[in-house]
């Protein structure tokens, strides 16, 4: 078996080292190498280009029969409501920004903090009904005045609602205690029960995910795998969609076989949800830090996006079939 410098493998990006076509090559060796290649394609996060999944209302083209087995008769391709190449290109762009280095949150300056406090007070005053915790908050905030009027620092209504819900879980005795809480980094949940509380009342952020290690990322992945189907059928569906997208943005591209298996497990739960057409009507609402990088392509929702990413980025193309 002599050395060769054959063409570059379109999947693995490497040249063939040995010429396996020679007559003297042991057929068992060829069979073994083919088996190794097949195992690699099915267990490692091979990254095929998005164009290999060409779509006309997602028709999947298999250019290389060895990459993945063809769907069996009766299996139906999932129709994605967007152009695959465009969406994966958008995802790559947003992911590059998400993974870029950024400063850790170290608290607000005086101007921003006071504007935030006034915004909280104004939001609570507009609430149609208040409980004991929100009444306590508005009482603490009665005398707060902004340092300057800055329309650019006005609170987003949805973000304000989550913030007030989070603050309402604690009893603050002084304004200084409230300020201290606002200037403190959000802790990373360590248990499923904590994630259940955390997700509906906190928007995800790149700063938050940058503080998570690999173990914590996969703890969140397992929590979503176990709970996303249940919570996507509640008022928290949009919240779970946001956290799903952020998880995908911050997962490494290179994963072990076991990690790929866990990603597949989550994508199967996501796939089970897309049967419900009402769920698919939910819009994909993401924080401004993503929209500011690149507007969300038309027709994208978190569930279909997750399937597209797992299929293309992690090489699990069969996930696009029911």
Curated annotation (Swiss-Prot):
**Pfam families to which the protein is assigned, alphabetical:** SIP1
Q: Which organism's genome codes for this protein? A: Eremothecium gossypii (strain ATCC 10895 / CBS 109.51 / FGSC 9923 / NRRL Y-1056) (Yeast)
* Stated name of the protein: Pre-mRNA-splicing factor BRR1
The answer on whether this UniProt entry bears the keyword Nucleus reads: yes
User: Which InterPro entries has this protein been placed in?
Assistant: Brr1, Gemin2/Brr1
What does the UniProt entry say about where the protein is found? Nucleus
Record gene name: BRR1
- Similarity comment text for this entry: Belongs to the BRR1 family.
Q: List GO terms (cellular component aspect).
A: small nuclear ribonucleoprotein complex; spliceosomal complex
């Amino acid at each position: 078996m002599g050395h060769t410098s054959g063409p570059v493998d379109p999947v693995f990006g490497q040249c063939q080292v040995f010429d396996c076509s020679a007559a003297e090559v042991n057929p068992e060796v060829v069979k073994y190498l083919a088996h190794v290649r097949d195992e690699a394609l099915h267990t490692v996060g091979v990254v095929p280009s998005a164009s290999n999944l060409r779509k006309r209302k997602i028709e999947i083209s298999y250019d290389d029969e060895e990459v993945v087995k063809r769907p069996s008769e009766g299996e139906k391709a999932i129709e994605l409501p967007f152009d695959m190449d465009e969406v994966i290109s958008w995802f790559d762009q947003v992911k590059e920004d998400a993974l870029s280095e950024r400063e850790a949150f170290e608290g607000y300056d005086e101007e921003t903090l006071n504007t935030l406090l006034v915004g909280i007070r104004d939001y609570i005053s507009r609430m149609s009904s208040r409980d004991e915790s929100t009444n306590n908050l508005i009482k603490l905030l009665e005398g707060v005045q902004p340092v300057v009027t800055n329309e650019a620092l006005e609170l987003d209504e949805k973000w304000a609602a989550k913030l007030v819900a989070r603050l309402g879980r604690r009893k603050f005795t002084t304004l200084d205690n409230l300020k201290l809480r606002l200037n403190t980094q959000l802790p990373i949940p360590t248990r499923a029960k904590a994630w259940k509380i955390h997700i509906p009342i906190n928007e995800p952020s790149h700063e938050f995910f940058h503080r998570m290690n690999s173990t914590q990322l996969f703890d969140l992945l397992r929590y979503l795998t176990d709970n996303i189907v249940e919570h996507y059928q509640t008022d928290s569906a949009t919240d779970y969609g946001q956290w799903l997208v952020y998880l995908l943005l911050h997962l490494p591209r290179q994963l072990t076989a076991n990690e790929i298996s866990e990603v597949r497990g989550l994508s199967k739960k996501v796939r089970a949800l897309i049967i419900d057409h009402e769920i698919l009507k939910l819009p994909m609402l993401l924080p401004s830090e993503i929209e500011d990088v690149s507007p969300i392509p038309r027709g994208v929702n978190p569930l279909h996006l997750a399937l597209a990413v797992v299929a293309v980025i992690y090489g699990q193309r069969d996930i696009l079939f029911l």
